[in-house]
Curated annotation (Swiss-Prot):
Binding site for ATP: G97, T98, N99, G100, K101, T102, T103
A Pfam family annotated for this UniProt entry: Mur_ligase_M
Protein's name according to its UniProt entry: UDP-N-acetylmuramoylalanine--D-glutamate ligase
Example of a GO biological process term: cell wall organization
Gene designation per UniProt: murD
Domain of life the protein comes from: Bacteria
Locations listed in the record: Cytoplasm
Length: 402
């Protein structure tokens, strides 16, 4: 059986490295490969022009591999990594939505690791490296993965709220939503789906629990929010993690939940040498994440660093939302001019910075002790950085130099 891997990302590399003895050697196609070579394991590294669909039995794309790419168009046996590993997948919880996927996945794993749950998918470990004998897989599941998944399904699907994101990849917001909801049609009567009330009428055989907001979700599961130490925007993530625990174990471990330590790059606070507050929220790559960050600091004047790769999303609503804040903007990245145009239309003061270091220095000239400097860019980072994490690292380095 010949397996072709599309893209040389974390997912496909893990498959090629861990399963070469069982299924390999693999043919790996990537636009960066200009000539045919072999890696150290004997896998072929090929240019997409060399793909012959008649000589391939299965094609597995990296989750973010563009659906309009010529390899996807030619593939006859396309399946996601979830489909590929479905036959050996233990019971699973899939967590999706626009914001909060990672935190909810980590919190749920924190609550359930004592029963043998392991975490993977879009966060941490690719499926090829997860223990197939674990009691439970808790998978952060992206819209990209769901787009390419047509067979696999979870026992529990926890869907956080959906807002516009990755529209240049999906083509439209409706396509994005439909990919998020696509798994429901494969779930059965023994499965459970937790989803926003707006999608409550989506056809499925699974038991549906819909919610309007974090308060409503807490009521549905008998969760006392006063016992949770996390506040918005992380409160919904915490409630969802407890809801998953309640379904599986009929317990609510508040003390264990409150011992969870938040990861870096999400509303990560630090002080400069002048005791001024800076916040690294580099992972806020869409408007709803930025709105949540702004709401957290609504009682302070906010100096917001915004911009990067906007992924084709219209951010007009975000800038309208900003009108209710005492805020100044510092535009960076490939979308600098676009951010300045949004600001002008919304009558918001904005500085043209283009690069992150200049934005930090410009803010430092204006920032007072009772104000907040916030990197919450509403855009992806790949126009200037290798990842959102690198952007956050550079931000903190710049702040520490002040």
């Amino acid at each position: 059986m010949k397996i072709s891997l599309f893209g040389y990302g974390k997912t496909t590399r893990a498959i090629a490295e861990n399963l070469v003895d069982k299924f390999g050697p693999f043919d790996i196609y990537d636009d960066h490969f200009t000539e045919t070579k072999k890696d150290t394991l004997g896998n072929l590294l090929l240019n997409p022009n060399d793909f012959d669909d008649n000589l391939s039995d299965i094609e597995i794309p990296s989750p973010g591999f563009p659906p309009k790419h010529k390899l996807i168009q030619k593939a006859k046996n396309l399946q996601s990594e979830y489909d590929f590993f479905y036959d050996i997948m233990p019971k699973s919880v899939w967590i999706s939505g626009t914001n909060g996927k990672t935190t909810t996945t980590q919190m749920a794993t924190h609550l359930l690791s004592h029963i043998g749950a392991v975490m993977g998918g879009n966060v941490g470990t690719p499926l090829a490296e997860l223990n197939p004998y674990a009691k439970l897989w808790i998978l952060e599941t992206s819209s990209f993965t769901l787009h390419y998944t047509h067979k696999a399904k979870p026992e529990i699907y926890a869907l956080l709220p959906i807002s516009p994101d990755h529209l240049s990849w999906h083509g439209s917001f409706d396509n994005y939503v439909q990919d998020k909801l696509s798994v429901l049609k494969r779930m059965n009567e023994c499965d459970v789906v937790i989803l926003p009330k707006i999608y409550a009428n989506t056809p499925t055989k699974a038991h549906k629990i819909s919610y309007e907001d974090e308060k409503d979700l807490a009521v549905k599961f008998g969760i006392d929010t006063e016992k949770i130490s996390f506040k918005s925007p992380f409160l919904l993530d915490a409630i969802m993690a407890l809801a998953i625990e309640k379904i599986l174990l009929d317990t609510l471990s508040y003390k264990l939940l409150n011992s969870f330590v938040m990861e870096k790059n999400k509303l990560e606070e630090l002080k400069d040498s002048q005791n001024r507050l800076w916040v690294n929220d580099t992972k806020a790559t869409n408007e709803s994440a930025v709105m949540a960050a702004l709401s957290r600091y609504k009682d302070k004047k906010i100096h917001l660093i915004i911009g990067g790769d906007d992924k084709g999303v219209d951010l007009s609503n975000l800038f309208d939302f900003m009108k209710g804040f005492d805020i100044e903007l510092y535009a960076i990245g490939i979308s600098t001019e676009k951010m300045l145009d949004y600001a002008k239309k919304a009558n918001l003061k904005a500085y043209k910075c283009e690069v992150l270091s200049k934005a930090v220095n410009e803010i430092s000239n204006h920032l007072r002790v009772n104000e907040v400097a916030l990197l919450s860019p509403a855009c992806a980072s790949l126009d200037q950085f290798n990842s959102y994490a690198e952007r956050g690292k550079v931000f903190k380095e710049c702040v520490n130099k002040i």
